[in-house]
Amino acid sequence: TQANFTRISGEYIVGDIGIKDISLVDEHGEHEVGDISIASLSGNDISRIRFTSKFADASYSGSRFITGFVQDIQTITTRKSMPSLYVNEGVGWNDDKYDLAVNFHDSRDVLSFFAPGTYIADSTSLKLSITRQGELKARLKSGRIAFKDKYLKGLDVLIDNPEASLRARISSDELAVNPLMMRNTDLFLGAVNDSVKVRYDFDNKDRTRTGKENSGNLRLNAVLFRDGDLNQGIRASFLPSRIVLDSEKWDIVSNEMQYCADKAMISGLNFSSPGQDISIDGGWAANDNDTLNIALSQFDLSLINNFTGQDYGIRGRATGKAMLISPSSDRPGILLNLLCDSTGFAGRPVGRLRVASVWEGEAQKFNVVCRNDIDGVRT
């Protein structure tokens, strides 16, 4: 190992360091990292840093040292477009400029030691520039980024900040969050003056392969705020949106939804499909009395199979109500009164199934009753 660093003034550090034949060992064995070289230069009011290794290369140049670069990114992005995220005002923009480029190679050895389960594909690249006018442009491209069984394939991220706003567009060929799989995804986030717009589209385009459509178009508007005690809060509502699961189209609409100080309120969140409906109203609070009401009308239980990772053969139609009662209430937990027709599990008929729960105050417990009726025989 060779190292020679000197602080020349303020935040600037110059010098270089070289480490040969790095090998890391853990319970899974030996990880060959190889050589690492870092060089830091400063001149003409520009700081330059170069990182070289077999798993990644990076270059940085800026009118401030890299520690100031991180602070300035906040200044021209989230602090400007979403000021409610911060209690203090922070520092202003000082007409600095920056350029950053990172290119990944085969990083499996170093990631398996420092971040087990993480994978970043060879040739993944990040480029970021900030002009003296505070204009940001950034792009991340990757064939695949994964963590365990979750991954993004064909990822392309674009970020900029025109006219005091912040915009990000994240697209991918494939997004997998077990058990969900979405293809041709496109997520847009836009923020200005604490107002946030979210647009998300996906289309698996598998009708010809499976005979069923799975796609979605979701639209959400939100406003960030702080209450009188400076607690962070958010108010949001769905614009007319839709999602198609196994060719069943669901329309999504809502009035206002709000979360602040460990308390959530939902007004008129509705998921509707021909012949079935889910409505959610009310609230939930960690330290207050409140109740969230969920009403089901002829809900197709087979949709649950899409979210279990395996096909358990669940089927039937559910109608009734569920109440989620906040933990600080006298009767915390879930109250149910559901009637399920033509119910089945694992391919076996269960018939008409009734599920109910009530709170027994003296014993401080829930009593749950589950009865089914098959061809007039009750169990």
Model regions and ranges:
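Interface amphipathic segments
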Residues: 1-379
